[in-house]
Amino acid sequence: MGTIYLFRKTQRSLLGKLTQEFRLVTADRRSWKILLFGAINVVCTGFLLTWCSSTNSMALTAYTYLTIFDLFSLITCLISYWVMMKKPSPTYSFGFERFEVLSVFASTVLAQLGALFILKESAERFVEQPEIHTGRLLVGTFVALCFNLFSMLSIRNKPFAYVSEAASTSWLQEHVADLSRSLCGIIPGLSSIFLPRMNPFVLIDIAGALALCITYMLIEINNYFAVDTASAIAIAVMTFGTMYPMSVYSGKVLLQTTPPHVIGQLDKLLREVSTLDGVLEVRNEHFWTLGFGTMAGSVHVRIRRDANEQMVLAHVTNRLNTLVSSLTVQIFKDEWARPVLASGAMPPNMLNIPDHHVIQMPSLKSTMDELNPMTSTPSKPSSPPPEFAFNTPGKNMNPVILSNNQTRPSGVGFNYGTTPYTTTFNHGLGVPGIGNTQGLRTGLTNVANRYGTYTPGQFTQFKQ
């Protein structure tokens, strides 16, 4: 018999979670309008795809893909309402704003993939151009144009509105802007409509409808069926050129990059923060775009020991909150200090060297693993080198090698005994089979010379 859990938490399926979130969105009356336009879009797309099949027009198919993109934009707008209703959770501490960024990126990338598919199909049609039926070509064009413009202008799509303004201009917008300047020079009243730049979605809808109208006229007059393929290529190229800057911008937001137009302002604010009273250093600063129009960041601030943490935190937050809405500031007090230098009298057993000493050398493998041959200091592979201090053994000291069969020199007042510094001898020099001498690395290289007892035959040196 299995274990019975009285208060076990039920796990909801993915479909159940989606249904719960959909009910949360539909609770807001503003989403009803989006759902209505979405239903109409599905019906219009179904009719347009049927007419594309009956007319055998590739240009109308490319224009229908713009209607499908409008459906994606409505879904993005619905996600934007859902993001405003949701509160941050432990898993998503910064909120759910990146979901609408991901939705914009996915919509623009799918539109570009559809444009590439149209280009591939159009290239195949150049080899053998089929006959185009113009019975419902013009009807489908006006139905798609009216619905696209009506949905774009009736619903305020916040994510796409922000991206279309923040992203770089497409080549279609630049060419239309040049023509608009020339036209506004003749008719100044049109400057409010065409300048500074038109909405890219409205522009591509109008340009695609004009291409289809030209296609209809040429096929009706001259039976020139190749113009349908040319119009399909033109609509696909315009679609790709319009969506590419938006996908690049939303992709940079997903990669947590800092917007280029904000870098100068952030540098100025960080310089101001570094000059605040009590602030010693500003480091590990990282700022990125969390969502459309929302920035997040984190910074580490090192302050003096006597500085007021709350006061510094308030000033830093006040300076950076003008640009960064979600800010994390970590305050560190200056607790760094140099290691205490050894000072005082020399221990008396420092110079105790036995007459006939036998020093038990440590294992060669363990010693070489534990000691660094350059500093004689225990080191770890991942740890930084030890801090330099005076009167300590180091690589700048000249080592001393003591002979094993040395004689007592006259005039030296050494007390012979066992030396306690068994771990400071050079490893490998006293091991049988390697050599018969043992090296003592010490910071007292010049001690013997200091007491006037150094003789060239007594000590020898080796180079590192």
From Swiss-Prot:
Superkingdom of the source species: Eukaryota
Transport found in the keyword field: yes
Chain ranges passing through the membrane: 34-54, 65-85, 99-119, 135-155, 201-221, 229-249
GO BP annotations listed: zinc ion import into Golgi lumen
GO cellular component, one term: trans-Golgi network membrane
Keywords attached to this entry: Golgi apparatus, Ion transport, Membrane, Transmembrane, Transmembrane helix, Transport, Zinc, Zinc transport
Its membrane topology: Multi-pass membrane protein
InterPro entries listed in its UniProt record: Cation_efflux (IPR002524), Cation_efflux_TMD_sf (IPR027469), CDF_SLC30A (IPR052005)
Primary residence: Golgi
Purpose: Has probably no intrinsic transporter activity but together with SLC30A5 forms a functional zinc ion:proton antiporter heterodimer, mediating zinc entry into the lumen of organelles along the secretory pathway. As part of that zinc ion:proton antiporter, contributes to zinc ion homeostasis within the early secretory pathway and regulates the activation and folding of enzymes like alkaline phosphatases and enzymes involved in phosphatidylinositol glycan anchor biosynthesis.
Record's subunit section: Heterodimer with SLC30A5; form a functional zinc ion transmembrane transporter.
Protein name in the entry: Zinc transporter 6
Native organism: Xenopus tropicalis
Organism classification: Eukaryota, Metazoa, Chordata, Craniata, Vertebrata
Gene behind this protein: slc30a6
